């Protein structure tokens, strides 16, 4: 093998390795993911890398038990949760008010969950949590992780308009 051919081979191999490592780094890059809830619009958006990839209808807190505005973090994810209410415990199943999934937030007692009352979706009907159709919360649950940011907006801000395309 002559020296000139070896040098060309080495350069080609180096370029290939650089391209492959850049592609791998891009693939391994964590997705910047957050959940945005517009309380007045009763909608939840899953935002990845700055754009809404999915928008869901939700139920929000009723007038006497409003959903809190603010920034939170996902701190727990529970499949088939048990509901502990005043003097009552409801195991996982169709009559469980939390539905099939619970995404617990850093604000104690608040979360995003399914429902045993799908007719409440789109209304101010909860005790402050965000209720979703059961199939929707299962889909969201599969895509979010502990540590993801969650933002509840009580007003239609520029950010809400951007996320929800208003």
Segments the model singles out, each with a brief description of its role:
Residues 2, 26-32, 66-69, 81-82, ...:
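Exported/periplasmic cell-wall-interacting domains
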Residues 2-13:
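Bacterial N-terminal signal peptides that target proteins for export
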Residues 11, 41, 58, 74, ...:
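Intrinsically disordered, low-complexity regions enriched in small/polar residues
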Residues 15-25:
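Hydrophobic h-region of N-terminal signal peptides that target proteins for export
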Residues 20, 48, 75-77, 111-116:
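Short amphipathic alpha-helical segments, especially helix-boundary/capping motifs
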Residues 24-71, 76, 92, 100-103:
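Cell wall/extracellular polymer interaction/catalysis modules
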């Amino acid at each position: 093998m002559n020296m000139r051919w070896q040098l060309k081979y080495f350069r080609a191999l180096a370029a290939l390795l650089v391209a492959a490592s850049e592609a791998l780094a891009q693939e391994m890059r964590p997705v910047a993911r957050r959940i945005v809830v517009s309380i007045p619009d009763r909608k939840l958006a899953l935002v990845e890398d700055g754009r809404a990839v999915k928008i869901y209808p939700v139920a929000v807190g009723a007038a006497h038990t409003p959903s809190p505005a603010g920034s939170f973090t996902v701190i727990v994810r529970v499949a088939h949760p048990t509901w502990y209410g005043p003097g009552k415990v409801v195991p996982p199943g169709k009559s469980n008010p939390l539905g099939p999934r619970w995404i617990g937030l850093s604000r104690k007692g608040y979360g995003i969950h399914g429902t045993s009352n799908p007719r409440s979706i789109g209304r101010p009907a909860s005790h402050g949590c965000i209720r979703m159709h059961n199939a929707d919360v299962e889909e969201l649950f599969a895509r979010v992780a502990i540590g993801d940011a969650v933002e509840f907006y009580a007003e239609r801000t520029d950010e809400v308009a951007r996320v929800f395309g208003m």
